[in-house]
Amino acid sequence: MSDPTPVNLEPVSVEDYVNIQRLINRYADAVIHRNGVQWGSCWTDNAVWDLGGGRLVEGKEAILKLWYAAMGGISSVVQTVHNGDAWVGSSANEATGRWAISERMRRANGDSGILLAHYDDAYAKVNGQWLFTRRFLQVHYGGPADLSANFTNDKEQLIARGIVADV
């Protein structure tokens, strides 16, 4: 989903952009408020959640099961959406997008950390509402809040993940 580059893609209409952004915001709000029903309502039944590193989860039921298990290991979390865009898909009811996020969290064991990442998304309009058909998490940093762990978005690592990087 990282190629072609966004500059070569046609943006969705303003109305679709706003509705997709509402989907993104509803997702982040559900993470913050630990609301699995709300979080699950963001996905199509046959969606795919790609967490990178070969961790691919298929189907809404399996995605929800993993999310509940993951949230069980986190005592508190705030997910923030920073910026993003959405582009026309192969039909009027399909689109793709990219959204930068960060998470600040405290794990159940008391450790705290941050995640800096972006999602490459695919959406479908179902009964007039945009939903995720795929979310591919591209982690750029995951570790202590002091940023002492390694970043994973240097040029070589981006290229290895199939992301166009020319500087």
Predicted segments, located by residue:
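Short, low-complexity N-terminal intrinsically disordered segments enriched in polar/charged residues
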Residues: 1-33, 37-41, 45
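Charge-dense, low-complexity intrinsically disordered segments
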Residues: 10, 14, 54-57, 110
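Short beta-strand edge/turn micro-motifs at domain boundaries
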Residues: 2, 94-96, 118-149
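Short, surface-exposed coil-to-beta transition loops
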Residues: 79-81, 114-119
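Short beta-strand segments enriched in hydrophobic/aromatic residues
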Residues: 31, 43, 101-103, 136-139
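Short, cysteine-centered beta-strand-loop-beta hairpins and adjacent loop/turn segments enriched
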Residues: 103-113, 142-143
